[in-house]
């Protein structure tokens, strides 16, 4: 089954995939250089800092002496990463061998950053000029609510309802793979869309941001400029207000889209307008593997396939409905059951057993999460068995042949099909056989020659 593929796990993977010209342009921004330095593997970071004030190429043999004998593989990974990001330039010389030098722009900006001690991309507004700002708890609640509303829009649109309050930029992201629309029917969730809903929040967020960046040129926005601005956001202080007048028109439009996702909160006073970054925005440059601590789960799974979800979230209820039968819903409790029919419906929509099991494990209630396994083994085994039930039959396009003039012609046709690895089935008594469609033309020519 097709899967939602996150090609780049974080911003740095996407930065590395940029053309050389755009990558060099990014390094004109001090904050990009700092963000990339933070993201590097420990050994790669060590190499950059050691070479920061060396203006001549460093021989590869000398760098190999900087690591222990058992660190060869880590050394190679670090060098490859630095070359991939164009931080290192590899210089080959027949006499002197291979050497490496730092990207001069990257080097100069890091030197300036170390000397100046680091300056914020833009200063927060004075508290006198802004109205009462939300607390960090209120801001986190707002971000969660916005993100859940965003995902509910995706689910509702998949059920035939129109998208409301979603910008055209975000609508295009939905249409790039999460939603499909036929001529007469309304939009429907694709297999990737169903799988997307079972991802954890960090994976979902990065998928949306990645598509937003890839879609940038269609909005006449330079992807390098967009990446630069998004990475700058990660250096802002969560909960502080920043004046919108300091931003370009493109950056203002970007913030409106990010507000849909809950990455920023937009506010307006009598004179000024400002944005307030949430924790989602300041964590943008963090990789999926290093993302925030595991959130508290809410699902209790029993051995009898009944499931209890302690949640008041409409979104969580709709996600559970993707693979379970909702039996009743109380203000803070959703009672449901995993059945063969509910799972078959999930499998038909492209969701896999592993995705369902991973979702249940990641969202296990704290009292269940500590036990091993957190989900009863009979439940996980049965989910996988029901999936294999649908995989027992493999569909292959084929052609059926009968009414052979003689036994010899039939046997010759069988041998010919075997040679071409196209024989699927044969009945010697009735002289019938089935071959793959790929060899149909060859089989037809062969039978034509046999009839002469």
Swiss-Prot record:
What NCBIfam families does the record tag this protein with?
Answer: tfb2
GO CC list: transcription factor TFIIH core complex
List the molecular function annotations (GO) for this entry. ATPase activator activity
Oligomeric and partner information: Component of the 7-subunit TFIIH core complex composed of XPB, XPD, TFB1/GTF2H1, GTF2H2/P44, TFB4/GTF2H3, TFB2/GTF2H4 and TFB5/GTF2H5, which is active in NER. The core complex associates with the 3-subunit CDK-activating kinase (CAK) module composed of CYCH1/cyclin H1, CDKD and MAT1/At4g30820 to form the 10-subunit holoenzyme (holo-TFIIH) active in transcription.
Annotated function: Component of the general transcription and DNA repair factor IIH (TFIIH) core complex, which is involved in general and transcription-coupled nucleotide excision repair (NER) of damaged DNA and, when complexed to CAK, in RNA transcription by RNA polymerase II. In NER, TFIIH acts by opening DNA around the lesion to allow the excision of the damaged oligonucleotide and its replacement by a new DNA fragment. In transcription, TFIIH has an essential role in transcription initiation.
Main localization category? nucleus
**Signal peptide, first to last residue:** none
Lineage: superkingdom: Eukaryota
Per the UniProt entry, what are the Gene Ontology biological process annotations, in alphabetical order?
Answer: nucleotide-excision repair
The entry's localization annotation reads: Nucleus
Specify whether Glycoprotein is a keyword of the entry.
no
Q: Which family does it belong to?
A: Belongs to the TFB2 family.
Fetch the InterPro entries from UniProt: Tfb2_C, TFIIH_p52/Tfb2
Swiss-Prot/TrEMBL keywords: DNA damage, DNA repair, Nucleus, Transcription, Transcription regulation
Enumerate the PANTHER family for this protein. Answer: GENERAL TRANSCRIPTION FACTOR IIH SUBUNIT 4, TFIIH, POLYPEPTIDE 4
Q: What is this protein called?
A: General transcription and DNA repair factor IIH subunit TFB2
The UniProt entry, under Pfam families, shows: Tfb2 (PF03849), Tfb2_C (PF18307)
């Amino acid at each position: 089954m097709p899967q939602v593929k996150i090609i780049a796990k974080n911003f740095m993977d996407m930065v590395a995939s940029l053309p050389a010209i755009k990558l060099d342009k990014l390094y004109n921004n001090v904050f990009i250089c700092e963000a990339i330095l933070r993201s590097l593997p420990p050994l790669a970071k060590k190499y950059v800092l050691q070479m920061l004030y060396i203006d001549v190429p460093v021989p590869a043999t000398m760098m190999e002496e900087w690591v222990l004998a058992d660190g060869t593989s880590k050394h190679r990974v670090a060098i490859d990463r630095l070359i991939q990001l164009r931080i290192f330039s590899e210089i080959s010389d027949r006499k002197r061998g291979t050497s490496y030098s730092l990207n001069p722009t990257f080097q100069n900006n890091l030197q300036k950053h170390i000397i100046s001690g680091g300056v914020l991309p833009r200063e927060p507004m004075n508290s006198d000029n802004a109205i009462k700002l939300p607390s960090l708890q209120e801001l986190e609640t707002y971000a969660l609510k916005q993100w859940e509303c965003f995902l509910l829009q995706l689910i509702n649109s998949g059920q035939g309802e129109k998208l409301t309050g979603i910008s055209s930029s975000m609508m295009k992201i939905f249409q790039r793979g999460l939603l499909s629309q036929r001529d007469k029917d309304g939009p429907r969730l694709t297999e990737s869309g169903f799988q997307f809903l079972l991802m954890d929040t960090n994976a979902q967020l990065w998928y949306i941001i990645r598509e937003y960046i890839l879609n940038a040129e269609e909005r006449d926005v330079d992807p390098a400029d967009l990446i630069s601005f998004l990475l700058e956001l990660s250096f802002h202080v969560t909960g502080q207000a920043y004046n919108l007048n300091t931003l370009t028109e493109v950056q203002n439009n970007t913030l409106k889209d990010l507000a849909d996702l809950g990455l920023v909160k937009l506010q307006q006073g009598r004179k000024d307008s400002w944005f307030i970054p949430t924790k989602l925005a300041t964590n943008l440059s963090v990789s999926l593997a290093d993302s925030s601590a595991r959130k508290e789960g809410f699902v209790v799974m029993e051995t009898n396939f009944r499931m209890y979800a302690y949640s008041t979230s409409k979104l969580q209820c709709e996600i559970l409905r993707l693979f379970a039968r909702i039996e009743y819903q109380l203000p803070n409790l959703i009672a449901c059951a995993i059945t063969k029919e509910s799972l078959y419906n999930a499998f038909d929509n492209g969701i896999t057993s592993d995705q369902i099991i991973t979702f249940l494990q990641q969202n296990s209630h704290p009292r269940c999460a500590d036990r091993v396994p957190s989900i009863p083994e009979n439940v996980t085994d049965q989910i996988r068995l029901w999936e294999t039930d649908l995989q027992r039959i493999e569909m292959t396009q084929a052609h059926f042949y009968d009414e052979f003039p003689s036994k010899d012609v039939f046997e010759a046709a069988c041998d010919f099909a075997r040679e071409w690895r196209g024989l699927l089935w044969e009945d010697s008594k009735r002289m019938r056989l089935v071959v793959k469609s790929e060899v149909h033309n060859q089989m037809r020519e062969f039978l034509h020659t046999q009839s002469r």
